[in-house]
Regions:
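Helix-loop-helix "hinge/cap" segment bordering the ligand-binding cleft or interdomain interface
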Residues: 83, 160-227, 242-270, 333, ...
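Conserved C-terminal helix/tail region of periplasmic/extracytoplasmic solute-binding proteins
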Residues: 39-43, 394-458
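Extracytoplasmic "Venus flytrap"/periplasmic binding protein-like
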Residues: 83-150, 188, 288-289, 367
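Short, well-ordered beta-strand elements
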Residues: 56-72, 88-93, 116, 167
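Extracytoplasmic ligand-binding clamshell segments of periplasmic binding protein
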Residues: 98-101, 219-227, 235-316, 339, ...
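Short, low-complexity disordered leader/linker segments with a strong preference
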Residues: 1-63, 444-458
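Hinge/lid segment of periplasmic solute-binding proteins
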Residues: 46-53, 121-177, 205, 310-314
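Mature extracytoplasmic/periplasmic domains
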Residues: 327-407, 418, 429
Length: 458
């Protein structure tokens, strides 16, 4: 990243954190532009008249909007908005998931931004503590009027780290789902209907029994030893609201103990489904269970179209209800048509979502419970009503609150977790070591964030 442009981000809580963590990528200096300074939060001020309403826009307005997204296909939805604003041209640019975060941040740094960005929750922590993005609680957006129309956890996950600004407006939220081969469960005498299998796998001994039985014939329920721990990770974030590490607990002791059994009994396939050999294993049925978001069914169909009717979906093993991700709109402060851009965001979240989202679960609670969506079936999944399952699961899970420290913490966690399992370390000792390493490695960043949070408190 270039110093000359990254200085312009005008960081709030995370200025010094990133300066330390990125070894000088963010330089200090005078005369730098403070992006979004003109849009400081007014949430502490008395609401102005009409502050609970959104600014009206002339439907005949002639304008252009640009939307940046991290997946393909959104352009097909644009005609819905253009029915309301026929003279508005909307250009959609999609980016590769692997690189979009850096490109979006660089655009915010340069001030060369689109009108709207769509950001995945996995990277949201990078955007939640910087200037250059609008506080959607402020006029003319007044998004606070919708707070009760979202789950409390999802709303909190879209707030800034100090909980004073609403940085994102969520479009959808996805649980993590178990995908499994029904025919293989039938063949080996295990429960094969979605509810029955989900209930059976709630007991870890039952899941391990399945894994041991199927492994004898070269069939696997997990790709690698620590994969099962990922399902537990989807239920609890690294840090609490006080930035204290919160994964050194009984839940993760159980997760690691299961992963250690998988390692000791060689129950993992040691294949990655995102490789050619992994895809082949999916096609052959060597991998009979996977854990993905609600998009997983389409992905399996792409890998193994000939397996139509053989796959089903159910809840996670071990009685877990985990969150995969959410898609969140953010509004760059340097956008040229911010009021219209907010109308665009508001429309897709609170109106268009009521008509169904191609199997995704709307973040907006009034858009859920659509009878047509609930009754829809997926032919590839043996005509299973998978959307109804997705809504059931999303209502039982809780979204997690991201922090700017999560990526660094995850790198330490993943490495030490894999090493600890491989070396057969005592579980409690392993977790103590991971906590100590994360807390000590990120001590400077944690201290800076805590001090800034204290200073921002009323």
């Amino acid at each position: 990243m270039r110093n000359r442009s990254m200085r312009r981000l005008g960081l709030t809580l995370i200025t010094a954190v990133l300066a330390v963590g990125l070894a000088g990528c963010f330089a200090s200096g005078t005369g730098t532009k403070q992006l979004g300074a003109e849009n400081e939060s007014t949430s502490a001020m008395p609401p102005a008249e009409g502050a609970d309403k959104t600014q009206e826009i002339d439907p005949n307005i002639s304008a252009e909007l640009t939307l940046w997204v991290y997946y393909k296909g959104f352009d097909k939805l644009i005609p819905q908005f253009q029915k309301l604003y026929p003279n508005v041209k909307v250009t959609v640019k999609d980016f590769l998931y692997a690189s979009y975060e850096n490109e979006f941040l660089q655009a915010l740094a340069d001030g060369d931004v689109p009108d709207v960005m769509l950001v995945d929750s996995a990277q949201f922590g990078s955007f939640s503590s910087i200037k250059g993005v609008e506080n959607l609680l402020d006029p003319p957006y007044n998004a606070g009027q919708y707070e009760k129309d979202f789950s409390e956890a999802l709303w909190r996950s879209n707030m800034s780290l100090d909980r004073k600004r609403l940085v994102g407006f969520p479009l959808s939220s996805s649980p993590i789902v178990t995908y499994y081969r029904k025919d293989i469960m039938d063949k080996y005498g295990f429960p094969s209907e979605p509810k029955a299998l989900g209930d059976y796998m709630a007991d870890k001994d039952n899941w391990l029994n399945m894994a041991k039985t199927l492994k004898q014939d070269g069939i696997y329920l997990t790709q690698w030893d620590p994969e099962i721990v990922l399902n537990f990770e989807r239920t609890q974030s690294f840090f609490d609201d006080e930035l204290r590490f919160q994964r050194n607990n009984e839940l993760f002791k159980e997760a690691i103990d299961i992963a250690k059994v998988i390692h000791d009994l060689n129950l993992a396939a040691h294949l990655d489904v995102w490789t050619s050999s992994g895809e082949e294993a999916v096609r052959k049925g060597s991998i009979a269970m996977m854990y993905m978001g609600t998009w997983g069914g389409d992905q399996i169909k792409a890998w193994a179209p000939e397996s139509a009717g053989l796959w089903r979906e159910t809840r996670l093993p071990f009685n877990l209800y985990g969150w995969q991700n959410s898609a969140n709109f953010i509004l760059p402060s340097d956008g040229k048509n911010k009021a219209l851009a907010w109308k665009f965001i508001e429309f897709y979240v609170t109106e268009a979502s009521k008509n169904g989202m191609a199997g995704s679960v709307p973040a907006y609670l009034p858009a859920r419970g659509n009878p047509k969506e609930l009754a829809s079936v997926n032919p590839y999944m043996g005509n299973q009503p998978v959307y109804a399952l997705h809504e059931e699961l999303v209502n039982k899970m809780a979204e997690l609150v991201p922090t700017p420290l999560d990526a660094k913490a995850a790198a330490i966690w993943d490495k030490m977790l894999a090493q600890g399992i491989e070396r057969k370390m005592d579980t409690a000792t392993m977790l103590d070591g991971i906590e100590e390493r994360i807390v000590s490695s990120l001590a400077t960043e944690i201290d800076i964030l805590k001090r800034n949070l204290e200073e921002s408190s009323p």
